[in-house]
Structures are given as structure tokens and as C-alpha cells.
């Protein structure tokens, strides 16, 4: 389709900074060689950052994801596709091999339906097999023009990733990382940690951009692409990209196109959402769902008690107990109060305030709600209940 998306090949570097990381890196190197991946030991990581060991993965690439998706949308509409925006799908009913896809004001029918929405909305097995995380990125202008001409990744926990990009003629270092589970750590602190790290390792002139995104981590490390488990034939899903949506999103198009057209695809069985119990990810499966159970119970206790709404600072949100009610309260800069139920409409966990993006985030399955309680990110389908004070 000739999509102009700033595509360019760049070498990728993965580097360690201590003995434990080096041992892990050596395992990755050996596994990569066995899999036929182009990898070799490197004398540089492309950055002004000290390292213990480093390996180069040749002919990696980067491209502009928005330009790419806009190009795909253009190609789709040119062959007759229709894109309907700002429409929440509430339900899918199937009758006589036809799927009735319902939204607030009507429905449409389809032979095949694909959930490409992180995890599908509602309560389903994929909510349990994926953990929601957020990642953070800074766009940094450097004093010394020491921008990397590669893709680099360290092995810290959480890790950092590095690349450069030109915006309106100005080159920027893109520094990402500080990942954490949605609704857990403080997003403001995540950005602060990245700023501190940047200042310690680069000659920073200014930080001109910052943003965050949500992704889902599958329990066994592989995405789920294929027929939706438990649903009627012809309902497909693609999720669990683990932050690699630019790769797995495109791969989804190939796999699902083959499945819909009755063709074989060598990756379909490996990535099937109905694959056998994820033995390799069983420990992670237990850990993540224990965390969900913990927040479901613990967050119902330890709520801040306030006597007056005046105690809440402007521009902030908190889950509090006020007049014997547990509430998610936000006070805007003019002092206007918005009070909501803090109970996520997905499975009943208690939401937490995200001060950076002004949202209520669920620590269990990653649902996010706007200040007025409307759904921003699934899997919840319904808004938080609103109270008048």
C-alpha cells in the first residue's frame, strides 16, 4: 500500500549492567542463536551508558505508529471499509451463523467479528490470563547531539528503552520505561524517575514531551490471536501484546485473515487463545491473580476518612469515606466536586486515582474511567455510578 511511516532499519542492542543480568543475557543469546536470530556480541550499546555485556540484533526497525495506522485506515476505506468512531459495542448475539453486534443506538451484522480492544470487554478467561501495565516515555532534547542511531534496551527492573526520532526537524531522544501495573504505582513518580535517570545518563537540554500507554502482559509471554474461547465460531480476538503491538498488531492481520479464509497459518496453533494451560507461565498466572484477589479485599479497608470536602485539595482525586459512604471524589481547580462509586463495574475492585492523566484506574484488570465516571479503557462496559453531594 506504500504507507509512508518513517520506516528505517536500525540495529538493536540489549545490554546488562551486573552479574545477574549478564547471566540472563547469555541465556537470551543462546536461545536466540538456536532460533536462528541474527545476533552477535557487541563492543557498544550505542549509548553513553556503561555496561557489562551487550549483544547486537541486526536489522531491527522502527517506524511511526500513528502514520502507519492512518495509512492502514486509508487503505481500508479505499477498498470499501467503513470506520465508525466513538461507538461502544455492548453485546454480541449470534443466530444462524450471523453475529448481531449491538451498540447503544442500534446494531449491525457480520459473519466475522474481531475483538482488537486489548482484552475483550466483560468478564472472560483472557481477563485472567493478561495483566495490565502502563509504560512511560519522555521526548528529550540533548545538549550534545548524542542521539542514539539504534534501538537499545537495558535489563533493569523495570527496564529502560532508548531510540531517537525527528519531530519538525528537531531530533529527540525517546527514553521509555518505569513500567508498573495499572492502578498500582504513582504515574507522577514514574515520570520523575525517568527524568532523574535521563539527567544521570545524558546531557539534557529540555524535556519537551511525555506520554504513557497501556499494554497487557500474557502469563506465558505469547499473545493470544485467534478464535475467542467460549464464543461462537467467527468471533476472534487479538490481545496480550506485551508492549509489542506494532509487531503483533500487523501479525494479527495475517493470522486472522488466513483463519477467516480457511487457510493454514503456521503460527495459529502456537498463538491460539485456546492453547493448553500455560505451564511455562503458571507461576506468573498465580502471582497476577493473587494480586487481583489482594486488591479486591485489601482496598476495601484503609480508606481515608474525611469530615469535610474542604479537606480535598483542588485538582486531585481520592477514594475516601465521607458521611459513611465510600466514594471516589475529584475536586477540579474551581472547587467543583465530582463524586463516584469507587467500585469498578468489571469485577468489583476499588479504583485508584491517576493524577497525571486525571483518571480512575482499576488495579485488577486495567479498566480506566474518566473524571465523570465514563469508561476510557475496557474491559468494563459500564460507567462508575455518580453521586450527588
Task: For the regions a language model picked out, list residue spans one by one.
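Dinucleotide-binding Rossmann-like beta1-alpha1 core, especially the glycine-rich loop
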Residues: 1-43
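Helix-loop-beta segment of a Rossmann-like dinucleotide-binding subdomain
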Residues: 4-14, 42-74, 176-181, 239
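Helical element adjacent to the flavin cofactor pocket in flavoenzyme catalytic cores
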Residues: 23-26, 30-35, 54-112, 116
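C-terminal catalytic lobe of FAD-dependent flavoproteins
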Residues: 31, 156-157, 181-285, 340
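Phosphate-binding active sites in nucleotide-utilizing proteins
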Residues: 60, 73, 77-80, 86, ...
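Flavin-dependent oxidoreductases
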Residues: 91-164, 304, 310
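Rieske [2Fe-2S] iron-sulfur-binding domain
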Residues: 138, 319-389
Amino acid at each position: 500500500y506504500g504507507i509512508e511511516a518513517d520506516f528505517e532499519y536500525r540495529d538493536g542492542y540489549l545490554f546488562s549492567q551486573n552479574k545477574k543480568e549478564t547471566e540472563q543475557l547469555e541465556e537470551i543469546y543462546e536461545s536466540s542463536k538456536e532460533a536462528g536470530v541474527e545476533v552477535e556480541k557487541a563492543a557498544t550499546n550505542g549509548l553513553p551508558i556503561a555496561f557489562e555485556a551487550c549483544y547486537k540484533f541486526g536489522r531491527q526497525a522502527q517506524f511511526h505508529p500513528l502514520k502507519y495506522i492512518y495509512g492502514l485506515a486509508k487503505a481500508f476505506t479505499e477498498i470499501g471499509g467503513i470506520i465508525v468512531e466513538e461507538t461502544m459495542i455492548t453485546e454480541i448475539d449470534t443466530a444462524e451463523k450471523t453475529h448481531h453486534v449491538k451498540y447503544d443506538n442500534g446494531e449491525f451484522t457480520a459473519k466475522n467479528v474481531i475483538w482488537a480492544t486489548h482484552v475483550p470487554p466483560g468478564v472472560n478467561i483472557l481477563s485472567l490470563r493478561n495483566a495490565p501495565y502502563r509504560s512511560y516515555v519522555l521526548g528529550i532534547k540533548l545538549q550534545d547531539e548524542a542521539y542514539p542511531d539504534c534501538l537499545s534496551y537495558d535489563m533493569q527492573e523495570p527496564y529502560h528503552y532508548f531510540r531517537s526520532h525527528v519531530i519538525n526537524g528537531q531530533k529527540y531522544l525517546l527514553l521509555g520505561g518505569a513500567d508498573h501495573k495499572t492502578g498500582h504505582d504513582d504515574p507522577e513518580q514514574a515520570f520523575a524517575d525517568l527524568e532523574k535517570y535521563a539527567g544521570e545518563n545524558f546531557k539534557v537540554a529540555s524535556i519537551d514531551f511525555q506520554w504513557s500507554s497501556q499494554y497487557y502482559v500474557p502469563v506465558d509471554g505469547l499473545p493470544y490471536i485467534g478464535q475467542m474461547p467460549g464464543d461462537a465460531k467467527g468471533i476472534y480476538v487479538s490481545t496480550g501484546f506485551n508492549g509489542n503491538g506494532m509487531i503483533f498488531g500487523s501479525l494479527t492481520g495475517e493470522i486472522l485473515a488466513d483463519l477467516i479464509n480457511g487457510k493454514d497459518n503456521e503460527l495459529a496453533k502456537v498463538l491460539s487463545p485456546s492453547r493448553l494451560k500455560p505451564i511455562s507461565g503458571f507461576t506468573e498466572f498465580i502471582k497476577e491473580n493473587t494480586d487481583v484477589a489482594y486488591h479486591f479485599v485489601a482496598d476495601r479497608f484503609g480508606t481515608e476518612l474525611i469530615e469535610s470536602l474542604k479537606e480535598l485539595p483542588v485538582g486531585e482525586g481520592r477514594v475516601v469515606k465521607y458521611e459513611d459512604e465510600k466514594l471516589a471524589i475529584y475536586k477540579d481547580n474551581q472547587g467543583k466536586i465530582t463524586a463516584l462509586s469507587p467500585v469498578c463495574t468489571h469485577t468489583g475492585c476499588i479504583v485508584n486515582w491517576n493524577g497525571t492523566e486525571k483518571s480512575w484506574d482499576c488495579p485488577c484488570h486495567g479498566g480506566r474511567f474518566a473524571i465523570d465516571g465514563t469508561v476510557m479503557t475496557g474491559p468494563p462496559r459500564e460507567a462508575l455510578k455518580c453521586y450527588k453531594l
